[in-house]
Structures are given as structure tokens and as C-alpha cells.
């Protein structure tokens, strides 16, 4: 029945109550099983941006790109990634930011963020998540298994690249943002995690079931409750949990009261509503004395455009609803510099 419903949901057959991104609905459903269309071609994203592609070629020419692969501890999948060493020599060269991409992307999709950190002297570690890019195929679990994969990456890289990993920061976009927040459940369980000084969560969800429900509501031909029931059964079979309501990054924030988090979100996000970022931020600061975390939303920015739009002549607003006087890249680097040396 599930497969039949997926076939019925083609763009030619649905009727919409309001404007909605069809691909985002298909994405949520298809990620509950392995789907080959979510294996993008490696590096194709860089070709769209000549400046970044040129910088990548510069890194390649100077041997600043070190490939690696690891086996996941929970199911022995192979994940592929790189250590990108900053060509700028300064006091940040022994510090590294780990970047996590979003659903249907590869690590190359977030090269703009890597570019920002590399130009400031920080190294970057990035990798393709399970079921994405070069990494092995396996159902996407929206942060459940991906958070353990992140722990595996941290342990491998700290052991292998000791000189570059005296201090770490985590950046996650969308699915990656959920992963870095849900990784909080592992923070206190491994001594090596004390090297992680901050988290940046960019346009992720606070509760997956609610985000999914918001998308399903726009289907006029199917009751939302029916689709949620089917999703719950599929999630239980795939993830081993009782439905999508179990995937709630917000419930993990209390586990890291002393970890500063920078929450970013575009106010024009049609995939995940920007109110999720405010909800996550408000929950996080409940446990902070003094307050360490920050929230910035970007007017006119859609999903994944925080840095693209936030560095142009568009308004960036902080948690007090005051207009920020700097672009999102400079604001992010200030946050990184403030906390990575603590």
C-alpha cells in the first residue's frame, strides 16, 4: 500500500491546498527507504560556482585535500570524506570545523561554508552521510544513526589528525543540523568530545513528525492522519523506533547546557519553517546560566540560503528581533572565534 500511495503522489496527480514544494514531500517519504535518486554526482555542486571550484583546484594543487574513509560502528557502512587543510597560516591551524550536509546533498553542496572557515585559517573535515554521495547506501534515519556516525568521525579524525584537531566545532545544515543536535546524547559518553567547543545548527527541524505533518497537510486527496499512520509503521520498521515523533532534536538540548549553539534559519524557508530555529533556541537557553547561545534569522533566505543571502544586502535579525549590522559569515566567524578557544 505504501508503494501504491507513493506512485499516486506524482506531481501530475496531486491537488494542493496552498503553495508547497513538491520535492520536499517526496524527499521525506523516499528517505524512509533507500532511494538511488538521492545519490548526487560528486563535485557537481562546485561546478555551479566558479569561484569555489577555483579555490578547490587551488587546494588540490597544493595537496591540502586529504581523503579518508571509515567504517561505521553500528552497521559497518563505509563513509567517505576529506580533511581540508587551510592554506592560510595562522593561530587557527590546529583547530577544525566538522561540516555535515543536508538530505539529497553531498559534502560539496556546503563548500561555501567550508570556504568561509578555510579562509579564516580553520581546517575543515567533511564527509558524505550514509545514503549520500560516495558513502554506502542505507536508509536515511534523520539523525538517529547519523549522530553515531558523527561520533565515529570525531574519534577517527582526532586519532588520525592530532595536530589539526586540538579543538573542534560542529556545523550542520538541515539533516546535518538535526544530527549535530542529536549528537548531544553522546557528548558526555566519550572523553574525546571535550574537544568540541560549539555547535552551529543551520535551518533544521525541532520535531520531525510536526514538520512532516505540515507538508502532508497540503495533500488534498489524502487524509494527513492516514499518511502519518503509514509513516509511523514504516519508521518503526526502518529505524526501530515508534514513529517519526521519536525524532526530536529539541529533546536533546538539555544534555549540553554548557555547549554554545548558533542557530541560523532563513525566514523564507519553505521546506522547514524558520519558527523551528526559534523553538530550538528558546529551549536551549532554558538550561544556560549565563546565556551562551545565539539565534539569527535571514530575511528572504530560503532553505539552505543562510550564507548565500545573509552575506548580501539582506536583513539579518537576531533573537531580540534587532537588525544585525554584519553579514552572516562575519557573525558566524565571531561566534566561532569566541568559543573555540574556551
Locations of regions flagged by a protein language model:
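C-terminal catalytic histidine-bearing segment of alpha/beta-hydrolase fold enzymes
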Residues: 278, 282, 286-342
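Hydrolase active-site cap/lid region
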Residues: 185-245
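Active-site glycine-rich loops that stabilize anionic/oxyanionic intermediates
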Residues: 94, 102-105
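Short beta-strand/loop motif that positions the catalytic acidic residue
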Residues: 256-257, 263-265, 269
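An N-terminal hydrophobic leader/cap segment in hydrolases
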Residues: 1-72, 82
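Conserved alpha/beta-hydrolase "acid-adjacent" motif
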Residues: 270-276
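Catalytic nucleophile-loop/oxyanion-hole region of alpha/beta-hydrolase
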Residues: 106, 132-166
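Conserved alpha/beta-hydrolase
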Residues: 114-136
Amino acid at each position: 500500500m505504501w508503494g501504491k500511495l507513493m506512485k499516486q503522489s506524482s506531481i501530475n496527480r496531486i491537488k494542493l491546498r496552498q503553495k508547497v514544494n513538491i520535492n520536499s514531500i517526496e524527499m521525506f517519504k523516499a528517505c524512509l527507504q533507500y532511494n538511488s535518486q538521492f545519490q548526487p554526482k560528486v563535485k557537481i555542486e562546485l561546478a555551479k560556482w566558479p569561484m569555489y571550484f577555483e579555490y578547490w583546484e587551488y587546494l588540490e594543487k597544493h595537496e591540502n585535500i586529504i581523503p579518508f574513509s571509515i567504517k561505521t560502528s553500528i552497521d559497518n557502512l563505509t563513509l567517505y570524506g576529506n580533511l581540508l587543510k587551510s592554506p592560510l597560516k595562522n593561530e587557527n591551524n590546529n583547530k577544525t570545523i566538522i561540516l555535515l550536509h543536508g538530505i539529497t546533498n553531498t559534502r560539496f553542496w556546503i563548500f561555501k561554508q567550508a570556504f568561509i572557515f578555510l579562509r579564516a585559517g580553520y581546517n575543515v573535515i567533511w564527509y558524505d552521510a550514509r545514503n549520500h554521495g560516495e558513502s554506502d547506501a542505507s536508509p536515511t534515519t534523520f539523525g538517529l544513526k547519523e549522530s553515531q556516525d558523527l561520533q565515529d568521525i570525531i574519534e577517527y579524525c582526532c586519532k588520525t589528525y592530532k595536530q589539526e584537531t586540538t579543538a573542534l566545532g560542529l556545523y550542520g545544515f538541515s539533516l546535518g543540523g538535526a544530527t549535530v543536535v542529536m549528537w548531544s546524547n553522546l557528548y558526555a559518553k566519550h572523553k574525546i568530545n571535550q574537544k568540541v567547543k560549539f555547535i552551529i545548527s543551520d535551518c533544521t527541524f525541532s520535531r520531525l513528525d510536526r514538520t512532516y505533518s505540515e507538508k502532508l497537510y497540503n495533500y488534498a486527496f489524502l487524509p494527513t492522519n492516514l499518511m502519518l499512520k503509514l509513516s509511523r509503521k514504516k519508521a518503526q520498521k526502518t529505524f526501530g523506533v515508534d514513529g517519526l515523533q521519536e525524532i526530536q532534536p529539541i529533546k536533546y538540548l538539555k544534555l549540553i547546557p554548557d555547549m554554545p549553539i548558533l542557530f541560523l534559519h532563513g525566514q523564507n524557508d519553505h521546506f522547514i519553517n524558520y519558527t523551528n530555529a526559534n523553538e530550538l533556541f528558546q529551549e536551549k537557553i532554558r538550561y544556560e546560566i549565563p546565556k551562551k547561545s545565539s539565534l539569527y534569522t535571514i530575511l528572504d533566505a530560503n532553505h539552505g540560503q543562510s550564507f548565500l543571502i545573509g552575506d548580501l544586502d539582506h536583513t539579518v535579525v537576531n533573537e531580540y528581533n534587532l537588525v544585525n549590522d554584519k553579514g552572516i559569515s562575519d557573525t558566524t566567524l565571531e561566534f566561532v572565534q569566541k568559543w573555540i578557544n574556551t
